[in-house]
């Protein structure tokens, strides 16, 4: 990584993007007929799959049931071939548990859980290929899967990462940019209200720079929303045609 120029004098990144430019996003909904909701997304070379079941009765001990809202259960996993490491991660390892917790916190802020008291909503996300922005891809795939399941949400929840290189805020970091070790943040946003569902930083950043990086992530999340909204509308149109409406 030594000597790698992350941002050229002309303002181009390693992969040819401008500072605030997203990687190419492709997504599909309804990829698994057996699930209540499902979606697949590619953000650059990062690929994630999300499956949703519920709302359904609480599984296991009924003491876990919440009298005023649904219990949101999120589980994260990554395929053993998803990174260059080829390292087998045990199910329930620390990274997977942390990601599952982050996803749960994110979707508890977005799903209208009070409409389904004493029930459970399961969100399973698997990363098939990791090349930067893993959390964001998981959130965006899960949002589409929750919508596919017909579960009411306050708003879309859209996520993107951002970093700071050579005095410039970069949106939607690739693996190369993440591996360089500069300050990075991950943001999950409810775009209509501007409410932040989750914000995480992994390094210190001066207050003057933080606002710029946060705005880069927020604008990127709004751009993601535009793309996801298009995917949802296309899915609804295709479903209507199949149903003969």
UniProtKB/Swiss-Prot annotation:
It is found in: Cytoplasm; Nucleus, Nucleolus; Nucleus; Nucleus, Nucleoplasm. It comes from Homo sapiens (Human). Non-catalytic component of the RNA exosome complex which has 3'->5' exoribonuclease activity and participates in a multitude of cellular RNA processing and degradation events. In the nucleus, the RNA exosome complex is involved in proper maturation of stable RNA species such as rRNA, snRNA and snoRNA, in the elimination of RNA processing by-products and non-coding 'pervasive' transcripts, such as antisense RNA species and promoter-upstream transcripts (PROMPTs), and of mRNAs with processing defects, thereby limiting or excluding their export to the cytoplasm. Keywords: Acetylation, Cytoplasm, Exosome, Nucleus, RNA-binding, rRNA processing. This is Exosome complex component RRP41. CDD domains: RNase_PH_RRP41. One of its GO terms (molecular function) is 3'-5'-RNA exonuclease activity. The modification N-acetylalanine is found at residue 2. Gene3D superfamilies: GHMP Kinase, N-terminal domain. The keyword Cell membrane does not apply.
């Amino acid at each position: 990584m030594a000597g790698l120029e992350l941002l050229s004098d002309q303002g181009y990144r390693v992969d040819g993007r401008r500072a605030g430019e997203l990687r190419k996003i492709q997504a599909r909904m309804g990829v698994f007929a057996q699930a209540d909701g499902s979606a697949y997304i590619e953000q650059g070379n990062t690929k994630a799959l999300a499956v949703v079941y519920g709302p359904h009765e609480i599984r296991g001990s009924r003491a876990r049931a919440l009298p005023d809202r649904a219990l949101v259960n999120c589980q994260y996993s990554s395929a053993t071939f998803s990174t260059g490491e080829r390292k087998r991660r045990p199910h329930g390892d620390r990274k997977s548990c942390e990601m599952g917790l982050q996803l749960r916190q994110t979707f508890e802020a977005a799903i209208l859980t009070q409409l389904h008291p004493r029930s459970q909503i399961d969100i399973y996300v698997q990363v098939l290929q990791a090349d930067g922005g893993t959390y964001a891809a998981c959130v965006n795939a899960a949002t589409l899967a929750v919508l596919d399941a017909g579960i009411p949400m306050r708003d879309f929840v859209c996520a993107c990462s951002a970093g700071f290189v050579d005095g410039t805020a970069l949106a939607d970091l690739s693996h190369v940019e993440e591996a360089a070790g500069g300050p990075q943040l991950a943001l999950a946003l409810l775009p209509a209200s501007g409410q932040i569902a989750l914000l995480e930083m992994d390094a210190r950043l001066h207050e003057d720079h933080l606002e710029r990086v946060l705005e880069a992530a927020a604008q990127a999340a709004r751009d993601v929303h535009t793309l996801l909204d298009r995917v949802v509308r296309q899915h609804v149109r295709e479903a209507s045609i199949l149903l003969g409406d």
